[in-house]
Amino acid sequence: MRFFHFYTPEQVPSSGIPECAVAIDVLRATTTIATALAAGAEAVQVFAHLQQLQEASQNWPASQRLLAGERGGKAVAGFDLGNSPLDYTPDRVRDKRIFLSTTNGTRSLQRLEGIPVVITAALVNLGAVVDFLRRGSFAEVWLVGSGWEGAFSLEDTACAGAILHRLGCSLNQLGNDETLAALALYQTWQDDLLGLLRRSSHGQRLLGLGPENDQDLAYCADLDRLSVVPRQVQPGVLASGG
């Protein structure tokens, strides 16, 4: 396997698509998606725009759907859920379709939806993702961070580096400078991932919204907490796969 890392969806090439792409948004969309599916959600359907989400959700029975939205780190008024993974408990989400839109992560997923195999990764399901990639033996894999409104994200690149580290990638498998940088970043911070999340600009942004968000950071930094691999089963729809 040969790996390429892109800091944001805006950096993703428009041609030469790989066999597999991994969308990463540690704070917090891909952590939340993994948590929702591990808690028994039927699927998570992602949208870049809130209006599209609201329109599509009307085609789903009210008793079997939940609207989840976040903008600027805050829950969208009138929605059932925000983007805190701690809110996605089995009693709330089991057997429900989650209609989700976030500031960054859902844009990344929509950018990748035409690739044959699309999965999502976070620190909480790192081991499951690594096992999936090992079994797949894809010739080329893109690791795509979500960033923050088009800018670099420390935690997403660290997660990409964690995947490369766990896979034991050789230098020949690192397809661009960003993969080498990601690997170096993770190896520097691997013993203090919560510290990295707290120091990241988005971590600081969440803590500025309320000290209770430190619980989210601790959860998002908890390596291998979940064994689920969210996989795209149709454009924009993720279910438990692998």
UniProtKB/Swiss-Prot annotation:
This enzyme's EC code(s): 3.1.3.71
Domain of life where this protein originates: Bacteria
Enzyme class, UniProt record, top EC level: hydrolase
MF terms in GO: 2-phosphosulfolactate phosphatase activity; magnesium ion binding; sulfopyruvate decarboxylase activity
Keyword Hydrolase: yes
Annotated keywords: Hydrolase, Magnesium
PANTHER family assigned: 2-PHOSPHOSULFOLACTATE PHOSPHATASE-RELATED
Family note: Belongs to the ComB family.
Protein name: Probable 2-phosphosulfolactate phosphatase
Organism expressing this protein natively: Synechococcus sp. (strain JA-2-3B'a(2-13)) (Cyanobacteria bacterium Yellowstone B-Prime)
